[in-house]
Amino acid sequence: MSAGSFSTEAAKFSFSPILNKTFGFLTNRDTRELLMKWSMNGRITAQAFRYDECFQPYQKNDFVWAFFQDPDVLSHLKIVSENSGQWVTLGTKVKKVDVQEILCSQLSMSLFDCLYSEGIVRESGHICKCLDEYLDDFTISDELRKVLLLDDCEKHDVFSQSDREQFLFLLFKHLCLGGAICQFEDTIGPYLETTKSIYKDLLSVQKDPETKQIRIISTVFKVSAYDENGMCYPSGRPHQQTFAYLIVDPLKRHVYVLYHCFGGGAF
């Protein structure tokens, strides 16, 4: 959505940062040590903002446009500087946004049971190794990374296309691939546990009063923003491991931002 297609709907949303909000996965020592090992520490963050009007998912373009136009967002939204590698705020005038709604309906980790049943992970939890292959910035040295990265992999279809579009799967994939100098795990446990921790940290659920079933009420968007020079958020350098998700809680009227910029993590 660009300035030329600005909607009056967007004007009604305003945002303010929730500065005292903490996220467990960023403060938990064990999780931080894993993020450091995966070369993501110091390049991944989560932030919280509140908004002041009722939000419906069909308003996603207007909502995200308003988010990136809000001066309180621009002065607080963190990015990793391409020049220094340090945290700075976005601060630039956004001319266009791209918004993709992400499927988010998984209530358990059963999505990953196929890793065991299809021989990608042994019963012990150890990830099966393979001969090294190389794809872009990634070394593929095990069956897990083959399934995640290679479309022509023999076992690619253990995850359906709809599985691969789920926020839970995307989180898992991001953690498995890590940053520029990622040290891969030999076992699947740390990836699954960290995925679950972040997922629960970011999403809100509610019990349906009629069916008594738990359902996710948060809406997830993958976003990017552009200034007069091109893409400026999450970075001016596109990479599949550089990402930003907005997670919207319609009851609390909170927006959580999950951000990562591919590179060498902090030690």
Swiss-Prot record:
Keyword Cytoplasm annotated: yes
A Pfam family annotated for this UniProt entry:
CFAP300
Gene Ontology CC terms, in alphabetical order: cytoplasm; cytoskeleton; motile cilium
Report the locations given in the UniProt record.
Answer: Cytoplasm; Cytoplasm, Cytoskeleton, Cilium axoneme
Identify the domain of life. Eukaryota
Principal location: cytoplasm
Write the record's keywords in alphabetical order, separated by commas. Answer: Cell projection, Cytoplasm, Cytoskeleton
The similarity comment for this entry is: Belongs to the CFAP300 family.
* Annotated function: Cilium- and flagellum-specific protein that plays a role in axonemal structure organization and motility. May play a role in outer and inner dynein arm assembly.
> Which PANTHER family does the entry mention?
CILIA- AND FLAGELLA-ASSOCIATED PROTEIN 300
Instruction: Identify this protein by name.
Output: Cilia- and flagella-associated protein 300
Q: Which organism is it from?
A: Xenopus tropicalis (Western clawed frog)
Query: Gene that codes for this?
Result: cfap300
